[in-house]
Amino acid sequence: IAVVASNGIDTLSSGFSGCYMASFRHNGIRYVAHIPTPNNSIKTSWNLAVKNRIIDNVVLFKPTEGLARIPGTIGIWGIITFNDRCYRLDVNENAPPSQAIRGQRIFNSIPRNPILTEIPPIAGGQMP
């Protein structure tokens, strides 16, 4: 699990293919996490932390869930805003005019299509 303290700021993570993104509080500090799903022990540990209230104020979503991939998309990113709104960002390398930066490369986003989609969080904060 990749975790960053993110008090008061929007957080973006890239490379979603089935992973989850979450925000939560632990010892009064707000964090955002990118959680891989192939590993059942991670899923079990996460669900236990939520159930046992080791973490609270949990907002969990899956950027790839329930939406068709927009043609030309080379990557799906997740965004959780400072006020826990969840978004999926479809990124395309070949279409101007908007651009997104990833590492040392600049990727163009898809024009004329809705590329930023708000996703409802998963109720209860546990992975199914």
Regions found by a protein language model. Name each.
Residues 1-128:
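Active-site microenvironment for binding and transforming phosphate-containing groups
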